[in-house]
Regions:
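STAS-typified acidic loop motif
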Residues: 2-31
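Amphipathic alpha-helical interaction surfaces in cytosolic regulatory modules
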Residues: 23-98
């Protein structure tokens, strides 16, 4: 089961993800992250994947969707601390938010 913990700061929102991100977990994560973005309207969203042990294509969709959402708000997304398993998925999808 995946979880997300948020650390807001002025103009930024950090989302620390842990666990396995699959199609079951993605929906709940998306709702939680979107609610925080809507409430805080950050200029920068940082998604930290250091605690993620597995990610399938649903995780790729989670990242792409948050990137589009941040772009629509005039902000940006940074993906950081992706373990090798996650980085391989990002490379296959040609995601360069890192």
């Amino acid at each position: 089961m995946a979880k997300v913990c948020f650390v807001p700061a002025q103009g930024t929102l950090a989302a620390y993800l842990t666990g396995e991100i699959d199609h079951h977990a993605e929906q709940a994560l998306r709702r939680e992250i979107d609610a925080q973005i809507d409430a805080r309207m950050p200029e920068l969203l940082t998604m930290d994947f250091s605690g993620v042990t597995f990610m399938d294509s649903s995780g790729v969709g989670l990242i792409l969707g948050r990137g589009r959402q941040m772009s629509g708000l005039g902000g940006r997304l940074v993906v950081q601390n992706a373990p090798d398993t996650v980085r391989r998925m990002l490379d296959l999808a040609h995601i360069h938010y890192v």
